[in-house]
């Protein structure tokens, strides 16, 4: 069965475009829970007005995410990727459903007790995020760049769709009794269904696509053990291939060597997410003041970020816009930090139009640079090395997000009633 795929060129295999669609949906599922939480932020500010929900929940999320990805990155070669990803999607599905149960149990009332439970649920989001994002990017690093680009684009699609649905539900229920709560609950219910769909797709559809079988079989022949369960799920039971001795298996670069060869990539990803998460979502909810859009203002800003992040992740498909020069990527990443004073002075002196423009630039550059790095970095490595590098790249994304969340609290310095 494996030999059938080993002698075929990837472009001649069926299922590439189906795989791209499935990868996009799986990308949506890996971030829709977190984006749902951000998008109903206006509701949580109504229920927990004294607890800085957007800042605190983001800060709670990150340690669980980082702790999990550190463990997975260190042990990636020994971990069953199929179980890892399935557990992640199942935890996502369960956790977002628990948000609905929590709200129904408390009847939408706040207090420190429900807030602590909310924080615990958000912690499980962090575990699931590290499990799925690291597992999927590591797995897709074994395959063609189009698949990892589709998955990463799906992360942005999650943000764009959740923002759009949130604006629709807010508009639909704004003038009804308890409308904000009803809109948030319907929104979370839709997100739960999306997560459940991802469980089914990853378990029963994705592993059976011919192009996915091809790349996983190729990775197994190069010594990758993480794909064995997925190959078995696809009906490839040739044990002589799955357990064959290969001299190259013992020659793979270790994590330290991979980091040294890709230090600019990991540092750039770290800096991209330090900047992004220092502004999103806390600054946009708490530091942008009152404008003509009223309670819609923060939601519109989040939506603009998400939509332009999505656009940025598809820009590399245009060849002359795909930045592959490593020095060029570093210059672009460092230039983004000019947005910090721009946001500060716009929040203080500018109007909502300028803020929307800055948020759009933040999203566009975040998506574009992320895809350029994730698609370029794994090239030239063996299957096991690609999987390891994929996990390391996600580790630095999440570490950057954590540092960014921490730095985001600095925006509260000098603000009245900040704490």
UniProtKB/Swiss-Prot annotation:
Function: May be involved in nucleoside transport.
PANTHER family (UniProt xref): EQUILIBRATIVE NUCLEOSIDE TRANSPORTER, EQUILIBRATIVE NUCLEOTIDE TRANSPORTER 3-RELATED
UniProt keyword annotations, A-Z: Cell membrane, Membrane, Transmembrane, Transmembrane helix, Transport
Chief place where the protein resides: membrane
A GO CC annotation given for this chain: plasma membrane
Topology of this chain in the membrane: Multi-pass membrane protein
Compartments in which it is found: Cell membrane
Name of the featured protein: Equilibrative nucleotide transporter 5
InterPro entries named among the record's database cross-references: Eqnu_transpt
Family according to the record: Belongs to the SLC29A/ENT transporter (TC 2.A.57) family.
Residues annotated as transmembrane: 20-40, 56-76, 86-106, 108-128, 142-162, 186-206, 265-285, 292-312, 327-347, 354-374, 393-413
GO MF, one annotated term: nucleoside transmembrane transporter activity
